UniProtKB/Swiss-Prot annotation:
<dbReference type="InterPro" id="IPR056736">
    <property type="entry name" value="SUS_EPBD"/>
</dbReference>
<dbReference type="InterPro" id="IPR000368">
    <property type="entry name" value="Sucrose_synth_GT-B1"/>
</dbReference>
<dbReference type="Pfam" id="PF00534">
    <property type="entry name" value="Glycos_transf_1"/>
</dbReference>
<keyword id="KW-0328">Glycosyltransferase</keyword>
<dbReference type="GO" id="GO:0016157">
    <property type="term" value="F:sucrose synthase activity"/>
</dbReference>
<dbReference type="GO" id="GO:0005985">
    <property type="term" value="P:sucrose metabolic process"/>
</dbReference>
<dbReference type="InterPro" id="IPR001296">
    <property type="entry name" value="Glyco_trans_1"/>
</dbReference>
<feature type="region of interest" description="GT-B glycosyltransferase">
    <location>
        <begin position="271"/>
        <end position="753"/>
    </location>
</feature>
<dbReference type="Pfam" id="PF00862">
    <property type="entry name" value="GT-B_Sucrose_synth"/>
</dbReference>
<keyword id="KW-0808">Transferase</keyword>
<dbReference type="InterPro" id="IPR056735">
    <property type="entry name" value="SUS_N"/>
</dbReference>
<comment type="subunit">
    <text>Probably a homotetramer.</text>
</comment>
<protein>
    <recommendedName>
        <fullName>Sucrose synthase</fullName>
        <ecNumber>2.4.1.13</ecNumber>
    </recommendedName>
</protein>
<comment type="similarity">
    <text>Belongs to the glycosyltransferase 1 family.</text>
</comment>
<dbReference type="Pfam" id="PF24862">
    <property type="entry name" value="SUS_EPBD"/>
</dbReference>
<dbReference type="InterPro" id="IPR012820">
    <property type="entry name" value="Sucrose_synthase_pln/cyn"/>
</dbReference>
<comment type="function">
    <text>Catalyzes the reversible conversion of sucrose and a nucleotide disphosphate (NDP) into fructose and NDP-glucose; although the reaction is freely reversible in vitro, the physiological reaction seems to be sucrose cleavage. Unlike characterized plant enzymes prefers ADP as a cosubstrate, whereas plants prefer UDP. Its preference for ADP over UDP suggests it may directly link sucrose and glycogen metabolism.</text>
</comment>
Amino acid sequence: MTCVLLKAVVESDERADLRQFSRILQLGEKRYLLRNDILDAFADYCRDQERPVPPPSESRLSKLVFYTQEIIVDNESLCWIVRPRIAQQEVCRLLVEDLTIVPMTIPELLDLRDRLVNHYHPNEGDVFEIDVQPFYDYSPIIRDAKNIGKGVEFLNRYLSSKLFQDPRQWQQNLFNFLRIHRYNGYQLLINERIRSPQHLSEQVKQALVVLSDRPPTEAYSEFRFELQNLGFEPGWGNTVARVRDTLEILDQLLDSPDHQVLEAFVSRIPMLFRIALISPHGWFGQEGVLGRPDTGGQVVYILDQVKSLEKQMREDLELAGLGVLEAQPKIIVLTRLIPNAEGTLCNQRLEKIYGTNDAWILRVPFREFNPKVTQNWISRFEIWPYLETFAIDAERELRAEFGHVPDLIIGNYSDGNLVAFLLARRLKVTQCNIAHALEKSKYLFSNLYWQDLEDKYHFSLQFTADLIAMNAANFIISSTYQEIVGTPDSIGQYESYQSFTMPDLYHVVNGIELFSPKFNVVPPGVNEQVYFPYYHYTERLEGDRQRLEELLFTLEDPQQIYGYLEAPEKRPLFSMARLDRIKNLTGLAEAFGRSKALQERCNLILVAGKLRTADSSDREEIAEIEKLYQIIHQYNLHGKIRWLGIRLPKADSGEIYRIIADRQGIFVQPALFEAFGLTILEAMISGLPTFGTRFGGPLEIIQDGVNGFYINPTHLEEMAETIVRFLEACDRDPQEWQRISKAGIERVYSTYTWKIHCTRLLSLAKIYGFWNFSSQENREDMMRYMEALFHLLYKPRAQALLAEHLQR
């Protein structure tokens, strides 16, 4: 690995500064410095030199520091991990004495990390290495990092070029693909009358002649049998105009293929009738579950997605002319049945999803093993021993409910993605992954110190499951580009799986190919029936507004509300999230407590979790409850804070955002990390100026200073100052609040709707279905490798955790 930036400093007039700075790091207490540590240390160095920190454009050393992700202090040398560009990493050892640069390999870096935590034992043999790179060597690969996350666009270009370069083979593939589609025993698209690709081309032209004399709006049922005699079955369209348009696209594709024509044609093929979404953990339901442990944005995401998916699928099937077959989509969300459901419907096998025709929550119980464990909710960190048998049982249930195998399986989060892998492998269907959040990037050093964290988090299982599922998936949906490969100054969630060590367990030399076309950025939407601008007064219910206004500001109910407001007329500073460490509501409360300027202008209102530790069985939630009380007392926030420990129905949460907006309040999302940020979309579309964490998805939702603001939740004073600056601007110009409010609403409506999301998702599923059918890529070797990791790494550790559960 060439260390270009490091070499440039060594060969420049800043060489002495580099040596002096390196010497300071060498003598410091920290052996492992992350980017923030490095930037702070460099700022201290510049201050000691009585000069400002130079911008990266003006100093080679400053540029090196800016692009350095980690420094490991190792006796007489420093190991520099530099990320000069997105998705590219360089590792070098710098000898402090004479500034000699020695490039390092990834295995050498992983050994060094092991040595740092005293888990390096070369005399006992090598550690197992995971390397998936050989399985991607013969697959098409994106070249430019800017195009990562645009996998389907790349794939369309690749496929259309193959159609052009090798027309005979690829026309045969397309012909074979058109012949395989059926619905409930009915042949679709083409029948046995069309005998070859050449014959297909001839019959398409003949069909276009037949249709040319018919009125464009004539229904398909009127000419169905005439087309059938030419070899065409249902699936081309519902009117003359639609059928003609689809056949013209196919004609163009056969004669002069290009990527846009290919996507337009494949996205019209009726091939998706049954979709299974997998989300085992938490309390998956429609009422009384949000705010429970492990139950939040993912549940909202999936339910909203399903409603929009069904609507889009119905529309697509109708446009395809499958009304003559009475074709209807069916969607199932597969989750876990929890026998002790605590008043929810999570012990009910089937639950119809509101607002749909044929979409259901299907709950399958974990096998019993130890009833003291399996009869109750199980933390997402403890769920791993039950997933394989859950997948076996769920396969039978899915077949029974669908009457068929699903056409597409969508996994959600680490556990759902692993089950999706097991099911897709058994059922031989397309697998899509949605991570929502990869825990490895949320918990600092979670892989390096996995053994210390194992009792609580079981990361050895989760990270192994992630590696298996992400490599096995046919395609992966991420909400943002940075979820895959980060930003110029921070690594992405998937990028963090490229190489890492699990000391004494395994080394990941190459864990994922970031340039694979399997990655696609498809942001979610927001439910516009529930969340809409505060000034849409005719859509708001006055009774709800009055009830919730009292709940937020004045109601005395110690069972579910803590705190009172001495001056309820102050501008509300609002946040709503689960009470866990990563969501960091205690950080917001402490920032509020430290800032007199915020307290003078605002009241803090939190909707979060429970009020009493006795009511929670979640360790993180209990710790955060205790911490929040301690902060309230430490900073004497009595009379300035309201903490509502309640679970709100979705409709109430929508109205609460609007009530806060009525009072020209603001919304703060202070998470230490947020994969996407649905609450940010909900707040913005409601009209609330929104402050979102700069760590994660909000970086792509919010445009800083235009339609919201970034905050750094690790610097509490800075976070408070950012909010205060906006409030001061509002004091100077009352229109400032309106400006940000309006811009936030426009941002959501232009980019984050479920219709955009679902249209894209269905198109992706069809393109990847065609790719898997027609390409010569053999994934079987990759899949066998993933199965080996499952059986040899994952399963023994899952069985050990199960043995532990049996003793409880």
